[in-house]
């Protein structure tokens, strides 16, 4: 039984990764060239809900046309892999309706609040955007008056949230590999291997704490140990979040990855989601430094705001 469970988990993780790659493709469809007068233009053709659609991409260039061809080829390969995984899941006895109604409702609740969650996390990272600006970036991928770095961070947060709210991902375990994938997404465009465990020393601004180099086996074991403790779901999520922050497992993006990883665990148990609201960020950062420098975890755990699925107002843990 354990072997089959592990097989299903690995297949679900692979399927979620493939779906994420498919969703992040800038163009999905078969490229076509249309001529108007002496000019040529590129479109992508795709069947949606039984109807053939044609979406304008841009003026024809050899480079853009080759990009569209590569995208189309990669999309076909991904869909072929997805069909193979679906067959393997069916043979392993996996059913799509294995998620409980609480978890399904929790996914919908988190999706409805995703823009605010991304905004709150951006504030925690020092991204200087207003909520309307953040919303514009999430919806359209760009905005004037905001640095390219901040836009990339916000888009990465959006993609990381979309990743964990995928049903296959929610059905997967909250383990080191899940955390590593989340870190890779939040570091996209900044580091080639953003989900790789840190191998160089780092310091933390405003703190005397110097995190030791993390050991992958130790990190895996500690995450497993926290999850297997007999504690309330929300307390486990907070412990996961703070442990990953303090350990500084990755070269960058640790707070972003830690919060989203904790939310993966929480949402997968139908427990709502964790937020650190904008107004609480200064106090949270102050207490986080205390926690880094040796204070008990309770000094900061009580400051983490928690939104429960059945109570849309924010409660203090």
Predicted regions and their residues:
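FIC/Doc superfamily catalytic core
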Residues: 1-41, 47-309
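Single conserved hydrophobic/aromatic residue that forms the stacking wall/gate
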Residues: 308-317
């Amino acid at each position: 039984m354990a072997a089959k469970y592990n097989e299903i988990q690995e297949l679900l993780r692979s399927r979620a990764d493939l779906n994420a790659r498919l969703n992040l493709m800038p163009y999905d469809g078969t490229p076509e060239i249309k001529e108007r007068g002496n000019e040529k233009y590129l479109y992508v053709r795709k069947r949606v809900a039984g109807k053939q659609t044609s979406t304008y991409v841009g003026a024809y260039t050899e480079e853009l046309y080759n990009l569209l061809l590569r995208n189309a080829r990669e999309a076909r390969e991904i869909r072929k892999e997805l069909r193979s995984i679906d067959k393997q899941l069916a043979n392993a006895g996996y059913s799509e309706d294995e998620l409980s109604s609480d978890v399904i409702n929790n996914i919908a609740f988190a999706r409805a609040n995703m823009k605010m969650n991304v905004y709150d996390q951006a504030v925690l990272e020092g991204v200087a955007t207003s909520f309307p600006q953040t919303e514009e970036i999430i919806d359209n991928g760009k905005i004037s008056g905001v640095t390219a770095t901040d836009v990339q961070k916000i888009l990465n947060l959006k993609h990381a949230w979309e990743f964990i709210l995928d049903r296959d991902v929610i059905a997967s375990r909250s383990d080191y590999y899940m955390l590593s994938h989340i870190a890779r997404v939040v570091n996209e465009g900044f580091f080639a291997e953003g989900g790789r465990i840190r191998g160089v020393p780092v310091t933390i601004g405003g703190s005397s704490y110097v995190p030791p180099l993390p050991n992958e086996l130790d990190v895996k074991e500690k995450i497993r140990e926290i999850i297997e403790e007999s504690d309330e779901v929300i307390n486990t999520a907070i412990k996961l979040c703070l442990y990953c922050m303090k350990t500084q497992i990755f070269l960058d993006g640790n707070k972003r990855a830690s919060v989203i990883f904790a939310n993966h665990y929480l949402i997968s148990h139908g427990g709502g989601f964790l937020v650190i609201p904008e107004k609480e960020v200064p106090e949270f950062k102050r207490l986080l430094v205390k926690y880094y420098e040796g204070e008990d975890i309770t000094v900061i755990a009580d400051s983490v705001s928690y939104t429960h699925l059945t109570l849309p107002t924010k409660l203090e843990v």
